[in-house]
Curated annotation (Swiss-Prot):
Pfam families for this protein: tRNA_m1G_MT (PF01746)
A GO cellular-component term linked to this record: cytosol
Domain of life: Bacteria
Organism field: Polynucleobacter asymbioticus (strain DSM 18221 / CIP 109841 / QLW-P1DMWA-1)
Protein name: tRNA (guanine-N(1)-)-methyltransferase
Keyword Cytoplasm: yes
Binding site for S-adenosyl-L-methionine: G117, I137, G138, D139, F140, V141, L142
Catalytic activity: guanosine(37) in tRNA + S-adenosyl-L-methionine = N(1)-methylguanosine(37) in tRNA + S-adenosyl-L-homocysteine + H(+)
Keyword field: Cytoplasm, Methyltransferase, S-adenosyl-L-methionine, Transferase, tRNA processing
Keyword tRNA processing: yes
Family label: Belongs to the RNA methyltransferase TrmD family.
Any one of the GO BP annotations: tRNA N1-guanine methylation
Length: 248
């Protein structure tokens, strides 16, 4: 999985490329992150990437030309490597809310280019001419698109085959089956008078699977009932699931 990231702060991405699961995936060439600074595509001595907004108002606007030249550089690198360019994604508050399903869709692209905005906004003409999709990670404002981009890349890289130590880990994450994850326990069996549920100690795999499924349903109904409705609409609930939900 290849990511190309247009950012004024490429140093920020070392947190993703050097540490943890994502860092290991990059070191093993399961994922690659290519960083592109639009200042490198500015011909003027000051490397200007922003200017005042037409019509007035606070803040500066990222200029279309440096961003478009950067995208051209990305596409040229794809062509040189024999890679078909994937979608161009702008991280923006007005974007579609990122979800686990979108993470799976991105994995299918094979490569994705992120535009990490800064300042007040990005010139709309660049968006109209170049951006294929816009994504948001929530209804709040951040200083730039770098943290949302890293959030999305983390979620996608986890899905790359071989990125996780256990091949089943990603499939058992929250949201992968439309529900929240079940509770997890590790040693010791008793901690501050709190016990690990007996069913997890018995070694009966079918009973453990049933317990985990029921706990997942119970937690989802209590904390995110909207996900239950979505799972039901998408045919992800079995007859046994529905019977259990009615018993709660």
């Amino acid at each position: 999985m290849r990511f190309d990231v247009v950012t004024l702060f490429p140093e920020m991405f070392s947190a993703l490329t050097q540490w943890g699961i994502t860092g290991r995936a990059c070191q093993q060439s399961l994922a690659s992150v290519h960083l592109w600074n639009p200042r490198d595509f500015c011909p003027d001595p000051r490397k200007t990437v922003d200017d005042r907004a037409y019509g007035g108002g606070p803040g500066m606007v990222m200029m279309a030309k440096p961003l478009e030249d950067t995208v051209a550089g990305i596409q040229a690198s794809h062509q040189a490597a024999g890679i078909k360019s994937g979608p161009i994604c702008l991280l923006a508050p007005q974007g579609e809310r990122f979800s686990q399903k979108i993470a799976t869709d991105i994995l299918d692209y094979g490569n994705l280019s992120f535009i990490c905005g800064r300042y007040e906004a990005v010139d709309q003409r660049f968006i109209d001419r170049n951006v294929d999709i816009q994504l948001s990670i929530g209804d709040f404002v951040l200083s730039g698109g770098e943290i949302p981009a890293m959030t999305i890349m983390d979620a996608v890289i986890r899905l790359v085959p071989g990125a996780l130590g256990d091949g089943e880990s990603a499939t058992q994450d929250s949201f992968m089956n439309g529900l929240l994850d079940y509770p997890h326990y590790t040693r010791p069996e008793i901690y501050e008078n709190l016990l690990v549920p007996d069913v997890l100690l018995g070694g009966h795999h079918a009973k453990i699977a049933d317990w985990r499924r029921q706990k997942s349903l119970e937690l989802t109904l209590r904390l995110r009932p909207d996900l239950i409705e979505s799972a039901r609409a998408n045919g992800l609930l079995t007859r046994e699931d529905e019977q259990f939900l009615r018993s709660l």
